[in-house]
């Protein structure tokens, strides 16, 4: 457990920058004008999976937005663990309620303010 805590502490700044980078991508899936941004975010998630040590990461096309799939095999005798999440966001409207740009993350009082955070 201590090794994990040390790893997290040593990499906290990098993890934060990677998260902020994803939050800067306007991956609004409900609006077709953001289709390229959703695809760009899918690519970024795939690259993060590979960088994190996944043996395999791929983008699976669908009739809508792509699915990003990754796997890490450590021991085939162990049970499978599934982690499910989403990389898209809802539209940021109404924009006048934002104190900063919804895709310009900022940290205030220890909390990240951005669409998708």
Where are these regions (language model features)?
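Acidic/His- and Gly-rich active-site-bordering loop/insert found
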Residues: 1-117
